[in-house]
Amino acid sequence: MKIILSPAKKMITDTDSIAPDGLPEFIEKTTEIQSWLKSKSKEELKTIWKCNDKITEQNFNRLENMDLYHLLTPAVLSYEGIAFQYMAPSVFEDSQFEYVQNHLRILSAFYGVLKPMDGVTPYRLEMQAKVEIGDSKNLYEYWHDMLYRSVIDESRIIINLASKEYSKCIEKYLTPKDKYITISFCEQAGTKLVTKGTYAKMARGEMVRFMAENDIENPDDIKKFDRLGYIFRSDLSSDSKYVFERKIA
């Protein structure tokens, strides 16, 4: 069973805590993307990154000095977004690190697929960015089915905790043999159930922590998740979609 999760824009370098364990699987493809980005002007990169001058400057300098092989941080400790804050890997026990290393895969526009302990350096790139390398019109074409082939294992089970931008990389290549379960976090807004972005990100991270703490190997056990006020809604769920509703006091 594999769990897929989106990356975060905000990243840090931490070479003092835990050493990474190996390099990402597709480091040669990453090198190709790095070269393509370095061939662009600062103004072109600002458009690709869709960010302000300050963030452009920061990431332009990162790109100029980027070393994909040295002073690396384990991926799960490098990302600082909301999901990763609620996963809280910095306080994982050894068994929880082992669980996520075996089961969690972080999808990345720059690295493709990351195991939690893969060594990474901060970058800025989203899967939807206008990047045309070789004959590829975009990054979805560039990565093709590589992410799917990397993630799928002998169990054929994938738990989707990623955003649509990243889960698309997997969904396009699913086969009838695969069991693909999307986890949906929502709450009542008037008469409708809606997904609130921030709460969903919090819940995705908390869900990974819950699965790691409970060493979950069977998708049915995910239904017991009851953190951050969420409860499983069996009446709204199916074999391919587990719906959790946040009960607002």
What kind of region is each of these model predictions?
Residues 2-6, 157-160:
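Short hydrophobic beta-strand segments
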Residues 4-91:
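Active-site helix-to-loop segments that bind/position phosphate- or nucleotide-bearing substrates
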Residues 89-239, 243-249:
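Internal, well-folded beta-alpha domain core
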